[in-house]
Amino acid sequence: MDQDAFFFERDPEAEGEAPRKQESLSGVIGLLDVVLSYKPTEIGEDRSWLHGIIDNPEENKPSCKADDNNKDRAISTPTQDHRSGEESGISRRTSESKTETHARLLDQQSIHRASRRGTSPNPLPENMGNERNTRIDEDSPNERRHQRSVLTDEDRKMAEDSNKREEDQVEGFPEEIRRSTPLSDDGESRTNNNGRSMETSSTHSTRITDVIINPSPELEDAVLQRNKRRPTIIRRNQTRSERTQNSELHKSTSENSSNLEDHNTKTSPKGLPPKNEESAATPKNNHNHRKTKYTMNNANNNTKSPPTPEHDTTANEEETSNTSVDEMAKLLVSLGVMKSQHEFELSRSASHVFAKRMLKSANYKEMTFNLCGMLISVEKSLENKVEENRTLLKQIQEEINSSRDLHKRFSEYQKEQNSLMMANLSTLHIITDRGGKTGDPSDTTRSPSVFTKGKDNKVKKTRFDPSMEALGGQEFKPDLIREDELRDDIKNPVLEENNNDLQASNASRLIPSTEKHTLHSLKLVIENSPLSRVEKKAYIKSLYKCRTNQEVKNVMELFEEDIDSLTN
């Protein structure tokens, strides 16, 4: 490209306004965009139009009118160039070659638009789609209803459609099939489609047409199968043989689908796609194969086959197994192992479960398997019970040892208590008995003489004096005068020997009778003692009961001990 297109002569009239006006870059950028969009062979034919100077809008009114005729597909580059020429301080010159160059530009722009729309009269713009650096692309079928008016919106939507079309080609299906729109075969739709039928869509680029050359019939079946509606009715009541047959069919269909995948990858003409396309293609292919497998399996399940003798045999086996389980439960209930038949059916212990399975098993292999499981579970349960019994025995032994220790401690404590009780009893025996027996007269040991001490006031000691008889007290009166109360009660033969006459005189005391006078004197001594009144009466009674002098002596010794204890 010549550099003369960028240099312009200045008008001498506009030299005064030059510092205020500047050359706009938008016109230059528009020219560059138009020039670079064509092949260098087309530009090299006639380049004289590049030397033309941008003129006034007054001289280029026919070009604006020519653009108004194409409002549907308006491209604003020539008009923008003329506007930028107005704003800048470009020199205004007139020449005849300007209209010719502008008309040539309009013709080339119409060719460019026709190649974009896919309806060109000559085959040259159709081959322009094979160039990788151009942005010519097919319109998406979603935009057929809306007429385009601006070039920028068209380019942006074409860029989005190119990304979607790359996803379609990675998946292996053409764009029209992916959006599940019906394909039209009549010629009217092809002519009225603005060049967007299947014939023109196959010329995106060499990279995309290589993938869509030979679509296999398996892929077409998979697409049709995927667009079908999923069946929702599934048989619930299936026997065991039907389930096994369905599982085998599922395995066979999965193997066939994997073989079809391998066949399709091997029969592709130009080998495997790049790694990025593989990584993007794997989840979609897996999803499609999952759908096909599910629909094929549901179709196989929904087809009701007539009852075969195999189904009858399995039903008979199930009936016999149920009857055998019921008989087993009745036997266990009758033997007393289980409480009720319902309990055996609902029990979750391992041995019971294996027993029920063994009774329901169809062949010897299952029976031996369940029998082995039952034996192992029984052995395990017995081991658990043995371990429980061992732990219980250990606990019982520990409790016995602890009870022995407690018994030993309690016996020792009991011995200590017994010894203490015996010591207390011995002390009480010494205190109470004083070591003597009262019934045996020959025994010289001391008789019991424990008396309870009252709270009587202590009487002062008074020595006996014969002058006391002259006092007014009854105690100190002589025998002849005072009333002898005790003499009537005491029946002592010693005292009654010479006491025949009751009205004796005072001279009777002078009769020599040792026993009588000694007892009387002892009585006086006891009465004049500082002891309490009850103790005095007790000593006097014991003194009158004495038969021998030794007994009298013992009584007087006890009396002296009591007086010593009081005085000390």
Swiss-Prot record:
It comes from the Viruses. Residues 1-24, 45-324, 434-455 are annotated as: Disordered. Disulfide bonds: none annotated. Residues 479-568 are annotated as: Interaction with the nucleocapsid (N-RNA). Residues 7-23, 58-105, 132-144, 151-167, 239-253 have a biased composition (Basic and acidic residues). Residues 344-411 are annotated as: Multimerization. Residues 33-41 are annotated as: N0 binding. Residues 107-121, 190-208, 294-305, 441-450 have a biased composition (Polar residues). Keywords: Coiled coil, Phosphoprotein, Viral RNA replication. The keyword Coiled coil applies. GO terms for molecular function: RNA binding; RNA-directed RNA polymerase activity. Residues 387-416 form a coiled coil. Pfam families: Paramyxo_P (PF01806). Residues 412-445 are annotated as: L protein binding. One of its GO terms (biological process) is viral genome replication. Essential cofactor of the RNA polymerase L that plays a central role in the transcription and replication by forming the polymerase complex with RNA polymerase L and recruiting L to the genomic N-RNA template for RNA synthesis. Also plays a central role in the encapsidation of nascent RNA chains by forming the encapsidation complex with the nucleocapsid protein N (N-P complex). Acts as a chaperone for newly synthesized free N protein, so-called N0, allowing encapsidation of nascent RNA chains during replication. Belongs to the respirovirus P protein family. The N-terminus consists of a long intrinsically disordered tail. The central part contains the coiled-coil multimerization domain (PMD). Forms a four-stranded coiled coil structure. The C-terminus constitutes the alpha-helical domain that binds to the nucleocapsid (N-RNA complex). This is Phosphoprotein. It comes from Human parainfluenza 1 virus (strain C39) (HPIV-1). The lineage of its organism: Viruses, Riboviria, Orthornavirae, Negarnaviricota, Haploviricotina. The gene is P/C.
